[in-house]
Amino acid sequence: MRARSVLPSVVKIASHLIIVIALAASPRSFAVEQASDVPAWLAPNVGDGEGQIAQVVLQRARALYFQKVREGVVRNPCYFAVDATRPNDLGHGDLGHRFYVICESDRSFRAISAGHGGGRDLKGITDFANGRRCAKNFGNAIDSRLTAGGAYVTGETKTSFKGYYRVSAKQDAVLLRSFVQFDGEGETENARQRAIGGHPAELLSNVCLRKDPHSPYADGEGYVPFGKLVEYAGGRSDGCTSWSPSDAGQIILMMKDKPTTLYIYPESDDIDAVTQAVRAGQSMSHAGLYWNASCLKEIGSPKFWPKQNLEPILAQYERDHPAPPQRPTPICNGR
């Protein structure tokens, strides 16, 4: 009799184990990755609305952060996440909020804008360029200028002199741009080799050389670069994470000498799963997947370009289309 009473329990336990094992073995999906331990104060910020963070993005970002804290790699009280499936340029000067700053110790959450990799159009060969609003193409190839989703840890910050620019009729300013190096793992492990990091979305255009021997930045002949300041927060990057200059100062300061984690969504598995679902005519919710609905409608389906496939194409393209000799920077006229 005792054996009979135990058997149903054993079968019940075994069935539960089978379910758990099946879930653990299945591909990562939005449905499986429900974050049950999201703090109550953070829950109102979770969702698909503007300024909110998708649940799967938050869950992975939190998991990465606490893993690195346990490993002793990170001691920063804050961590970062990016949802690169959301729109960047909303039009009419408005930018989408898809870079997230989360500090659980002081219960703060902030969403700001951030650019994505522009990709490239290799005329007559292949096209993996992205528009300003939504990213369709992702990848980890060197010189691809694409965003690669996955895990990163912030590294050292380097600040470099870019030149001078005019702020008023009688006043010039110096552009010193900081760059935070990211170190990746797995598919993003070549982040340092790709020079992937974070920086302000600003540069100097129409640069010429102006005589200014008293400048601490003057070259050996007494010249300094001078150009027009261009801010491109609503534009695209070479694969890096770019912020508006006003946001960048605060974000970079948070990272200085205090490494932390950055999780960028989507990864290649997510992209492949979404593409398969689109081909099958499945909705994202029905397939247990996540992609911003507005951008998915615009791009049709996303694509991941792995480095082992794309780098040989890029290398051949560079051999067939060598860059012209670099011209010397012209001397400024009357500036």
Label each PLM-derived region with a short phrase.
Residues 243:
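A conserved hydrophobic position in a structured secondary element of the catalytic/binding core
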Residues 1-11:
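N-terminal secretory signal peptides that target proteins for export/translocation
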Residues 27-31:
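Sec/Tat signal peptide C-region and signal peptidase I cleavage site
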Residues 32-238, 246-335:
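Cell wall/extracellular polymer interaction/catalysis modules
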